[in-house]
Amino acid sequence: MYNSNITDITTLLPHRYPFLLIDRIIAYQKNFNILTIKNISYSEFCFTGHFYKNPVFPGVLILEAIAQSACLLVYKSFGMSYKNNLFYLTNIIDVKFKKKVIPGDQMLINVFVDKHHHRLIRFVGHVSVSKYIVCKATISCLLTNDVVSR
């Protein structure tokens, strides 16, 4: 089991409030997978207009949480950070939203490396709330500098 704090995360990721969507890393296996948490609070910036009297965490932000988790996995696996290698989302496929995410929920984000070839890496992400999958997606990301294929 692995446990991190927000300082560990902000050392690796360039994202800051309101777009830092990872609160904690709870498990990590080098070059394989990462498990992260995002706590959903009513004070999230998106709830002022999404939707009035019926707040729903936007699906695009769930996908961004998957991408940020993937970024953390790569940065930790290769001893990098945003300071020496940026990570760009290039593709999103096979997205399925199964349930809505609302204030008070805790998203558990599980991301696995699917394929890795030099700078291009494909991931599969599953997001769950209370043991129910709320989103599945396959994403691809590109590093600005080459890394050795595993």
Curated annotation (Swiss-Prot):
Q: Which InterPro entries does the record cross-reference, listed alphabetically?
A: FabA_FabZ (IPR013114), FabZ (IPR010084), HotDog_dom_sf (IPR029069)
Leader sequence range is: none
Domain of life per record: Bacteria
Q: Which controlled-vocabulary keywords does the entry list?
A: Cytoplasm, Lipid A biosynthesis, Lipid biosynthesis, Lipid metabolism, Lyase
Q: Name one Pfam family in it.
A: FabA
EC number per UniProt: 4.2.1.59
Q: Which GO terms describe its molecular function?
A: (3R)-hydroxyacyl-[acyl-carrier-protein] dehydratase activity
List the source organism. Buchnera aphidicola subsp. Baizongia pistaciae (strain Bp)
Any one cellular-component term (Gene Ontology): membrane
Protein name per UniProt: 3-hydroxyacyl-[acyl-carrier-protein] dehydratase FabZ
Example GO biological process term? lipid A biosynthetic process
